[in-house]
Swiss-Prot record:
Disulphide bond pairs: none
Family statement: Belongs to the CbiM family.
GO molecular function (one): cobalt ion transmembrane transporter activity
Name of this chain's protein: Cobalt transport protein CbiM
Keyword flag Ligase: no
Involved pathway(s): Cofactor biosynthesis; adenosylcobalamin biosynthesis
Coiled-coil regions listed: none
Primary site of residence: membrane
Length: 261
């Protein structure tokens, strides 16, 4: 009986992922560019962000290997975290020239598996989007990965554990982790664009204020919506995948995640 229930849950999750992938790939509108588009950054800055992001990606591979070897049954949940990020970050609204606003979807995976594992999942999502959907690019993958797959997940991880420590309210912690990680992603993107293209008058500060101000118009409501959606997904996981959450020590009053920093 238990095997049949587990098989049914796995089948429904796989079907959900396949349907989401099909809808995004086959029915997506023409792209306006995902994050920073291919060729937009000067070569020096593109190389710089690649060098900054690579160590996190390598550490993330080691973290993922450790997680899957220790608990192979978590592979399906890892795939779900990646699919959640892929679907949410593919929902785009045009914003500043050379970029766009969208949810990031990295908060859930960061809470479940830690920021290092999420750095790999997020980078793979960005790679697939660049190759399959023409969102973002390969030269700018380092910059996009640093903002969405590294800075955002680390923020989500720390915010979640700090909120749990201060309030003990898990759903509030998850909402804040997802929302603020989304906002930080776009603060970092604004910094990256301002560094590459300082304003003739006012330099970096003026350029950052321009990029961040325009992003905020669409990103603040998107971030709040992402936080609410992440809480709904968390409730679903508690109902249908309690064994995995217990294995990760994320329910029954324990706030430690599978990966420690």
């Amino acid at each position: 009986m238990l095997r049949r229930v587990l098989a049914s849950k796995r089948a429904s999750l796989i079907l959900m992922g396949m349907l989401s992938f099909y809808i995004i790939v086959s029915a997506s509108a023409p792209a306006y560019a995902m994050h920073i588009m291919e060729g937009y950054l000067p070569a020096g800055w593109a190389a710089f962000w690649w060098l900054v992001a690579l160590p996190f990606m390598l550490l993330g591979v080691r973290s993922l290997t450790r997680i899957t070897k220790a608990n192979p049954e978590l592979k399906l949940l890892l795939a779900l975290a990646g699919a959640f990020t892929f679907v949410l970050s593919a929902l785009k609204l045009p914003s500043v020239t050379g970029s766009c606003s969208h949810p990031t979807g990295t908060g859930l995976g960061s809470v479940l598996f830690g920021p290092l594992a999420m750095s790999v999942l997020g980078s793979l999502v960005l790679l697939f989007q660049a190759l399959l959907l023409a969102h973002g690019g390969l030269t700018t993958l380092g910059a996009n990965a640093f903002s969405m797959a590294i800075a955002g997940p680390f923020a989500a991880y720390w915010i979640y554990h700090l909120t749990i420590k201060l309030t003990g309210k898990q759903r509030i912690a998850i909402f804040l982790a997802a929302t603020l990680a989304d906002l930080l992603t776009y603060i970092i993107t604004s910094v990256q664009l301002a560094l590459a293209f300082p304003a003739p008058v006012g330099g970096f500060i003026a350029s950052f204020a321009k990029f961040a101000g325009i992003f905020a118009i669409t990103q603040i409501p998107l971030a709040i919506s992402e936080g609410l959606l992440t809480v709904l997904v968390w409730n679903w996981l508690q109902s249908y995948s309690p064994q995995e959450l217990q294995l990760l020590k994320l329910i029954q009053g324990e706030s430690q995640s599978h990966e420690s920093i």
